[in-house]
Amino acid sequence: MKQLTGAQIRQMFLDFFKEKGHAIEPSASLVPHEDPSLLWINSGVATLKKYFDGRVIPQNPRITNAQKSIRTNDIENVGKTARHHTFFEMLGNFSIGDYFKEEAITWAWEFLTSDKWIGFDKELLSVTIHPEDEEAFTIWHEKIGVPKERIIRLEENFWDIGEGPSGPNTEIFYDRGEAYGNDPSDPELYPGGENERYLEVWNLVFSQFNHNPDGSYTPLPKKNIDTGMGLERMTSIVQNVPTNFDTDLFMPMIGATESISGEKYRSGDAEKDMAFKVIADHIRTVTFAVGDGALPSNEGRGYVLRRLLRRAVRYAKKLNMNRPFMYELVPVVGEVMKDFYPEVLEKKDFIAKVVKNEEERFHETLHDGEAILAEVIAKAKEEKTTVISGVDAFRLYDTYGFPVELTEEYAEEAGMTVDHAGFEAEMEKQRERARAARQDVDSMQVQGGVLGEIKVASEFVGYGTVATESNVVALVKNGEYTDSLQAGEEGQLMLDVTPFYAESGGQIADSGYLLTDGVKVLVKDVQKAPNGQNLHKVVVEEGVLTKDATVKAVIDTKNRSSIVKNHTATHLLHQALKDVLGTHVNQAGSLVTAERLRFDFSHFGQVQADELEKIERIVNEKIWESIDVEISQKAIEEAKEMGAMALFGEKYGDVVRVVQVGDYSLELCGGCHVDNTASIGIFKIVAESGIGAGTRRIEAVTGKAAYELMNDQVSLLKEAAGKMKTNPKDILTRVDGLFAEVKQLQKENESLAAKLSNIEAGNLTDAVVSVDGINVLATKVNVADMNNLRTMMDDLKNKLESAVIVLAAVNDDKVNILAGVTKDLVGQGYHAGKLVKEVASRCGGGGGGRPDMAQAGGKNPAQVDEALAFVQEYVKSVSK
């Protein structure tokens, strides 16, 4: 068997099947752009479904690929077992109605055993087949020459996911030798059993039947081949190492973690080994996922990334790493994978920035969680219980992102346990709340009453017209059918033809009037009815509106004009965000009204002022270029091939509406737009903010609203200049002068504060007491913040030379605590970090730090004196 790297095995596989007439399909993005309902690409065949289901005919029916994949159904097993991963590569060869079993089996054997390729010893290979698959048995035994005793028949060798294509499969196993199992009484020690000796190398699926709705199976007219070989597992066999983690696909990340942590992999500590494995696996997943456009967040694929990073940070604590470090591994992943995935190194700076940002956020959360947990433990001790309630554990998890496993570790240190059943009960309550929230989405109560019974058609013609003659085909009042609405009454109605746009895709509904002889009806809102028609919410202002009446339906054109300006502007904004911030930006929500637009998007940090200026400039330049906006109907596949942006979670039909702004923007959209960007006039960003981790929001105005906003800003500038007794053009110079004056005054104030602190520190030396021969000072002081506490601490250390000091200051019902230990006493075992943690816990807080200096916070000022009294107890305990 050859000595090969993981990269060489990958390339060798693709080269082999290229020689056999296969087209190499590029590895697709982990974010499945062609299937918005799928969270991740999770297999080699996932990106080829369009070929297997007949939607697209491949140019070559023989395909091979090396597909990056993510599976997260068993995250908790990663690191515990030899081969569980969240990110992996699947090597595969596929036949779309071309070759079948004989070629698939023959080529698999050739690749594995030929000296030109992998060069496995044939005697170490065994295969499994379905008991009724005599064709596979004949090929394996008579053509390939595998002895009968190494062909195992297993009932589970049948690939079936319910209705649709299905068929038997054959798996190839490699015998790693007696070192991995030699107990003849082990019932699982056989190819296909649960053991470490016989490892599955390759799975060949023969899709030859259709599983019918009645449970029967009938032969497929065109038979397919779908195979899968896990690169990581194959590499572990070729490199003769005990686990996938010991291959060159993982060891560089493990080695880098060793250097950062100072700990050693495979040092005999199973917990530390698991930590190394978790970190190596999870950084691969996060690196590739972020590179493909996913960002940490609280839902969907972003939540998966957040969970993986937090799990890695938790395990890093076992390696004594309490700072952000995962981001340092990103370029290491890039180097390992650069031969086949050069884009990772190209994007490494961006990916590392995202990872570091998320790590820093979680370390802040951990600190907050530790403080809350200290309160929970103290409360439990007061109540004389040794169990942390499920409610408290869930609050730590849900509010502070505090893993329950970490809560358990702290509880164990305090001689306590966690109520797991209570925790799971709280988790289930949250799931129920989420399920209920998802079901409660019927705006205007359009899902209730008789509306679901209305099947009459209603055609929307509002893209091309603003007024039309229509018939009232359904009239509803208080959830029931009615024949008429009187003046002053409200109701809901449907028209056979309507120019009124129903709220959808972030665009609000049109408003306007229905007019006929002596009747005037205000259309206040329009929503989609249960069966898809436009449902108009109306109030009769004059006359009596009757069912079957013929009316003139007229939208408010001034209102619509403002709406379409803002809607087209969101498309320009979306593309400008991608241009300036990066291709990871994706729409996360929008609101388009007549007054303003709001656009939510994925991004890991605040958008900087200069970036906002660039974004605004780009949008305005596209407006001033007077670009035509073209709208067309396209087949979904054609639209995607054109590069049209689709939204995650949206369901699209076979034919979609494509909105194209020149060669700049291309999106699938059902909304209303301007004919030319010049109609927008001007675009002005009003605000940028964060609305959740990984999601930002931009609010903006266009046209007249933008002009009025800028006019107001100019007026404000003039008013400010007047108050500063200067001209608007000189206001910056005036402000700079004022800042310089303030800075000088602050400097003088700080100097006075330092002198006062020094005087107070001198007075405090009288409060020093001797405890077992150690100078101890534990007292409250009157200072404004932690900086002044540090200054005072430095003065006291210099004056006392040898002492244990704890200072506490109360401001705005909060307690700042600072502990200091002089160098000579640090050497005797006194530790400021441990001391301040204990003191803070006694006044409702937490903290920590170095042996010589540490800080903490507390929430109960009334308990400060009691907390400070503990300092003498601590000194006595150490001096014993």
UniProtKB/Swiss-Prot annotation:
GO terms for biological process: alanyl-tRNA aminoacylation. Keywords: Aminoacyl-tRNA synthetase, ATP-binding, Cytoplasm, Ligase, Metal-binding, Nucleotide-binding, Protein biosynthesis, RNA-binding, tRNA-binding, Zinc. Zn(2+) binds at residues 567, 571, 669, 673. It is an enzyme of class 6 (ligase). Binds 1 zinc ion per subunit. One of its GO terms (molecular function) is transferase activity. Pfam families: DHHA1 (PF02272), tRNA-synt_2c (PF01411), tRNA_SAD (PF07973). Belongs to the class-II aminoacyl-tRNA synthetase family. Catalyzes the attachment of alanine to tRNA(Ala) in a two-step reaction: alanine is first activated by ATP to form Ala-AMP and then transferred to the acceptor end of tRNA(Ala). Also edits incorrectly charged Ser-tRNA(Ala) and Gly-tRNA(Ala) via its editing domain. This is Alanine--tRNA ligase. It comes from Bacillus cytotoxicus (strain DSM 22905 / CIP 110041 / 391-98 / NVH 391-98). The gene is alaS.
